[in-house]
Amino acid sequence: MAYPELDAADFLQQLARRKEFKSLISPPVDQKELIRDLRAHFVQIGGPGCEKGGRAFFPCDPYASPFPSIKGLQLHNAQLFVQNFQNPNTPYSRLLLNWQTGTGKSIAAIAIARQFMNHYMNFIENAPWIFVVGFTRAIIQTEMLRRPELGFVSYKEVAELHRLLHIAKQSGSTTSVESRHLNGFVSTLKRRLTDRNRGGFFQFYGYKEFASKLFNITSKGEEKNFDVLSLFHRSDEAEDTLNENDISQFVQKISEAETNGLIRVNQKIMEQLRGGLLIADEIHNVYNIQERNNYGIALQYVLDAFPPHQAPRAVFMSATPVTGSVMEYVDLLNLLVPRHELPNGQPLQRQQLFDSSGHSVKWKKDALALVERLSTGRVSFLLDTNTNFYPERIFAGKMLSYKDEKLPYLHFIECPMSEYQLETLKQLGPDPKISSNAYSIYDMVFPNPKFSKQTEPKAYGLFNSTETPTALSMASTDWLLENGVQIIEPSRRAPFNVSGSFLSLQPPMHISGLAFYSGKYTQMMKDILSIIRQGRGKILIYHNRVRMSGVLILQEILQSNGILNEVSSPVGTTRCSICAAIRDDHTHSDHQFIPVRFTILHSEIEPAVRERSLALFNASSNLEGHQLRILIGSKVIVEGLNFQAVRYEMIMSLPLDIPRLIQVFGRVVRKNSHMELPPSERNVTIYLYVSTTPDGGPELAKYAQKLKEYILIQEGDKALRKHAIDGFTNQIKIDKPMLESLPLSPSITPANVGATVLNTFEAYGYGEQEVKTISNIIISLFMARPVWTYSELWKAVSTPKLIQGITIDNKLFSEDNFALALISLCYSKNQCKELWIQNRLCTIMHVPAKPEHLYVAAVLNHKKEPVLDIETYIRDFQPPMMHSIRITKYLEHSQTKEPFQVLYEKFQKDFQDEPMEQVLIHYPASFHYTMLEALIIDNLAGMGALVEVYKKFFIAFSKKDIQPFPDIFKIISHVPGDDNTLVGYATEDSVRLITSREDKTWHEIPLYMLNINVKRKENDIVIGYMESKGKALKFKIRPPIQVLKKNEITDIRMLNRGAVCETRGREEQQKIANQLGISLNLTKISAIKLCLLIRNNLLQKEMEARNQPNGMQDGIRWFYLFNDKMPSLVHTS
């Protein structure tokens, strides 16, 4: 066979010599030397000193990266390696991607799957399927649908997806027309992945769903309470060992159970997997001892049930493949190594690898050598700490000892328990064993109704999750008031929680505050306020639990100390996101008051709501945290979620084990997660809080025990990784023990790889891939420099790391492939490869010249003919501007079918002499939004009066309007124009700021960041608004919301929609007019004219209210305009 077998003595050596792998050894390059190369080739496009670099082709940005780059997704070397290793041309059946969090495991798996999909497309019939199984399957689907480079969607479809996402977000409703269009479009794309008639080859399952669909318990099995797990019998539950006869005969036992009518194996799934590909993400979840399930049994069955040549290939992924217990290595190896390649052709048993006595476990002699041998050729290991891409990880606090033994790796924020906590802990005895329902004792205790005053001698608190809710719920109202406790109304998703001043750092004089009940949470709050005062930066707070002392109480602690949730309006005690001062004391003149806000993610929140909150927290507009400063997350965030630009991570409780703690670290330390921040801020400070007592305490004891267990796991990790397939390319050398790994050196180094072997490179199409890579590099070089000789271009192409994102060894490129790439890009009468270079549509032309031929990026004219002109690159060239009408959510408020151009012409005709304010009530929202974007992007002439109206009503904003908000002004400061230039406009739920007129790109911020309160108090008389009726806009009125809430309105139709003014009784119209101060002789005025007077009066009052000091925050509401969100009205009678 072309590729070496895994049992070959020199397997890794043979693999490393093949060009498709050897070329992925990233050559070391000195940064100063690389800059010299950039300047020597005249391709430095940015960075300090680029203006003096000797190049004069295109404008140079001294603040940008100096390197040319290739647009779009580029697989990094580790991803390319596993794509080349695990594909239909190689004989390797199973692979574990043991990559640290945030390094692109999902993209690697998709790249592997794409190779198999291309292979299966050649099958005439019975093509196998690709199964993606795991809790994060939705994330993998999302990656497939947002990355056109992966080959599942086109660039045009991705652009349409972004467009639909934007307008659906603006609609503010999951049931709007725009949201339905988005869902339909996404469903169409997803069906392409899974529908064989549309070219789909994928099946997506969660672990539980896969296991339940594979093993169907029959009615007979249900009657006998049959459990598949019973076939995987535990002979000793305490030690969790397996009966070797049972496990070795598991497939046979399934067959017997099927024969006996207890179970039905899904043969359709089995046939789909025959010869297919199985991708299993976060594989440690399928055999975790602490969370017993049948997920691993299902995977083991489908891998073992087929003859070896028909079994599906498998890719497993995990940053921490063993978590709960070191004995999980047995389960991992049984999945990773085909049955016939295990010792004696039988599954591994735990007694083969471990000696155990009671709760003590240790590796047997030679067990680690067996792990090394079995994992050779089956593991890819990646630990990437390149600070060019990853934020620096900084631990706050100090290392601690427990019982005179120093705890390794971790630094802690030591939080001594309060006296009240210590008294409570005494109730558990001298050597307390903390049960699962008593975990709150690690964090805090609750006031105890048994004591009238918590400060009385011998008083102790509550902490048991069974007893605490009952005791507090039955407490008297007087006791609750005396102790500052409020019971939160129970709901289906939050059965019990409390709030109140007892959670405050500064409670009323007679109430014991947070410091009395929790040393840990008091320290957390002090650190949060200190961080806010220090400057910008988002904060992630993690707790493994939801109830009792988990994320729900953390939410209440933040709110009790002046930090708002996503939607609450600021009050006097709300803290500022810039200086942490409360609003009543905010006297800073150098910045506006911006409330500090948090959001929360846990399993009991609807997935759609979690996704929205995460998107807002991660948004580029929230880079500094002034929209959402803090995110509180439970264990739901441990896997599959990525957080962008988080500067501080506060860990309030230990997850189940140290490997999962590493997963929590990895949520915020991810590749490119901090690239939008300045270099000096690309770091994450981690606060690991632990409650302590004078003798250490139960929480510190828990960390000590888990760290001891983790050392054993690390020994297994080292053996697993010792002969990693890509050790010689990833070049991971660890000299001293660290949290992620014990000392480790690759068994093969780049220096001893040996001579390059080309047979498989040429046989399996890697030469074609090299031509494509070279083509992309050539294009990037022409974008930096428009004229090259052949020899100059070849030298630049073969210079390593000259192009950002290309880290393969360019020196191994074939010049023949370079020539092929160049020819394929050059213009001819039969071919014109179009390239966009500096906003010019160009093509590469071959120009015969002496002493050497030239290659020139020539501009194409309107006939797509190349133009070689000496002035091409100094002439200011602007492509024709294309104007489009944006159909947005606002069409749901306006059913008019008239296009913008018709309305625009009507507007120019009607408003030559009319008061310009009337335009706000004569045209639908779609007209206004298209007009606003035209005013901002195209700077329409002769529209000064309309601009002033938009500005008077705080609908449009100029640069001058944004200047009082320094952090927001940074977003638009680079946009050309003076202080009066329009740069943004307000929608129902955000302000859209232009960032590039040329690209028509926008940046959205919440309304409150410009001190716009969407919930201003309504006046006590009447509320006016406009509503679409066909092509007409009708003026409607309704009572103010505070009147509606008093149930004075009994007509439900009136309650929900208001009524057209002209349809109201004459008496009611006159009453409203009199209350508004309209002093004409109303008896002689028609109903139509009277309603016009009321409408204009309300509009005038609305403008005056908005223009009062702080009017957009506290002004009285009179009229809802096209961009105002109407409150939801609910009939309560």
UniProtKB/Swiss-Prot annotation:
Residue span(s) of domain Helicase C-terminal: 524-724
Domain of life: Viruses
Induction comment from the UniProt entry of this chain: Expressed in the late phase of the viral replicative cycle.
Pfam families xrefs: Helicase_C
UniProt function note: Putative initation factor.
Family: Belongs to the DEAD box helicase family. DEAH subfamily.
Protein's recorded name: Early transcription factor large subunit homolog
Originating organism: African swine fever virus (isolate Warthog/Namibia/Wart80/1980) (ASFV)
